[in-house]
């Protein structure tokens, strides 16, 4: 094979490399930059009690990747139509990072409901505190949330050992379990952040090889 043919082959290789790099980035899309994470939810054990205007529920949560996108909780209405607002705050120490409100009237009995955060909430230490209250609710017109201390497997229920900080607290009193909550978060991937640097390094390597033929 003569030099002319080699150079022609190198030009083709460079063109193919560029096309493949662009195609891989386009096909990979957001999956190159981050992955979505969901924690396992505890099985519903018992309701924590009516959440009235005199009630504050707190619990620590772990946010893998440090970016909170949403929560899924299990609520109950006591088989009645209630009104008011469930106020959900995400705190880092005394700092409120995010706040969302849930329309109590729209909640279904003994069912999951979702809370989305837009924009995504950045959690500095990958841990945060949930603070839940219902400032308008009174006894007989309030909802509740489920707590649990076990998790369902393929064959049976497995008890989960919870530390004190992992338990739910109602008005500062530790409850027998943690909130049945699924934490939705996002973890940034280094590959996506440095993809074009990696692609450029590969392109330069191919170009240098061709130059020294």
Q: Which positions does each model-derived feature cover?
A:
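Surface-exposed loop/edge segments in extracytoplasmic proteins
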Residues: 94-102
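Beta-sheet-rich sandwich/jelly-roll-like modules and their strand-loop junctions
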Residues: 2-92, 105-114, 119-125, 134-210
